[in-house]
């Protein structure tokens, strides 16, 4: 169970979270090694109970889920899936996850693979009334559909870039700062190809005129170019480290071992709470966009929980969940219902703050965005190259 997350960003909670962590194993080959047996919640007994298996940062805590159940009529048993796409998909494909959970939340990119194998079911959008309120550009996110059917619901969105310490790094507006020899030994990237490769590809495409078509889905030649670039800089000791997991990334900033690094925006919130004057840079090359999408597991249909699953998703867009999640994580559920809910419940949420957060994310997506892809065409080659980087 993942109900231990409280208000704010306590690092202990996130020490095991790797929100867009390296997919270390293939799903149907080496990935089977990651399946194991799950630590299982109690099985949902009633048709109005849903076992929700999603990224820990999507949890809103016991009090939040109680309010959610009161408003929606759906009781939620939340379990953190770690959001490492490789093991999650493997547990759905070869493990027992589909026997236990009803609805899952996962970084976008795996929907088509899961749908083709019959592991997830399509959503009936007509049963999700609040889906009409979802921002259109969120509905247009890649990876949501397969064969004309909706398999992913864009529940949480954001765009990632660079974290910089103001009095050490000054004004940063380019990923080039990560590779700047003047900052040698004071930069870092995440130990995850699903983030670090696309950041590097975005930089090379836009600032070094590299012939890269789609940074989120590199050809073999493009991937080789990007990885050789990273390996060279690693050997030159440009990077302090490749960080892994929430706590390490936060600690690097808190101790000021690193002055500039690619990373997640909630790390900025947490570092500021520790007194670090850091900021999230606006990169001239563009952001890495991502969405955590909600998927309907096929076994939930067999167990007769389709109606409750659709009620759950509808309630995610009703406003309360978006307000609560924004307060806890600084993440946005892409609907204006959040502002409407905050306005109607100003004793619990600050309407101006909710609107400001929404405008902040909208502003990011009004610029240049390259979508993260957790399952690029050559994902196994990505894994091979990333291991070479680690060994370099």
List where the protein language model places each region.
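N-terminal secretory signal peptides
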Residues: 1-21
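A bilobed periplasmic-binding-protein/Venus flytrap-type ligand-binding module shared by bacterial periplasmic
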Residues: 161-168, 202-203, 291-305, 324-327
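N-terminal export leaders
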Residues: 18-35
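Conserved C-terminal helix/tail region of periplasmic/extracytoplasmic solute-binding proteins
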Residues: 359-392
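Mature extracytoplasmic/periplasmic domains
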Residues: 296-366
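Periplasmic-binding protein-like
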Residues: 223-233, 274-298
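Early extracytoplasmic/lumenal segment of secretory-pathway proteins
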Residues: 47-113
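Extracytoplasmic ligand-binding site segments that recognize negatively charged/polar headgroups
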Residues: 58-62, 105-111, 115-248
């Amino acid at each position: 169970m993942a109900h231990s997350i409280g208000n704010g960003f306590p690092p202990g909670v996130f020490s095991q979270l790797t929100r867009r962590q390296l997919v270390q194993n293939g799903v149907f080959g080496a990935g089977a090694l990651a399946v194991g047996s799950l630590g299982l919640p109690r099985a949902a007994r009633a048709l109005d109970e849903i076992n929700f298996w999603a990224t820990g940062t999507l949890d809103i805590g016991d009090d939040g889920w109680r309010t959610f159940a009161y408003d929606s009529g759906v009781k939620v048993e939340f379990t953190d899936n770690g959001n490492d796409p490789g093991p999650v998909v493997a547990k759905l494909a070869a493990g027992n996850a589909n026997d236990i959970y009803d609805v899952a939340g996962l970084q976008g990119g795996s929907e088509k693979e899961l749908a083709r194998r019959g592991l997830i079911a399509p959503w009936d959008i007509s049963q999700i009334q609040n889906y009409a309120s979802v921002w259109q550009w969120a509905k247009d996110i890649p990876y949501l559909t397969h064969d004309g059917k909706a398999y992913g619901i864009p529940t949480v969105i954001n765009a990632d870039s660079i974290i910089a310490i103001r009095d050490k790094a000054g004004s940063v507006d380019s990923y080039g700062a990560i590779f700047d020899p003047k900052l040698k030994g004071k930069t870092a990237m995440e130990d995850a190809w699903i983030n670090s490769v696309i950041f590097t590809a975005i930089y090379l495409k836009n600032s070094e005129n590299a012939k890269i078509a789609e940074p989120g889905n590199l050809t073999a030649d493009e991937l080789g170019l990007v990885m050789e670039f990273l390996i060279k800089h690693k050997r030159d000791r440009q990077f302090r480290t490749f960080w892994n997991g929430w706590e390490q990334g936060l600690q690097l900033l808190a101790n000021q071992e690193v002055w500039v690094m690619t990373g997640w925006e909630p790390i900025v919130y947490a570092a500021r709470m520790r007194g670090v004057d850091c900021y999230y840079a606006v990169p001239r090359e563009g952001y890495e966009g991502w969405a955590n999408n909600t998927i309907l597991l096929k076994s939930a249909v067999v167990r007769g929980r389709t109606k409750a699953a659709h009620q759950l998703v509808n309630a995610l867009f009703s406003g309360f969940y978006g307000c609560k999640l924004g307060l806890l994580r600084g993440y946005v559920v892409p609907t204006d219902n959040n502002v409407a809910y905050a306005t109607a419940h100003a004793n619990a949420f600050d309407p101006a703050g909710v609107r400001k957060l929404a405008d902040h994310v909208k502003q990011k997506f009004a610029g240049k965005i390259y979508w993260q892809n957790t399952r690029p065409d050559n994902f196994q080659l990505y894994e091979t190259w990333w291991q070479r980087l680690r060994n370099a």
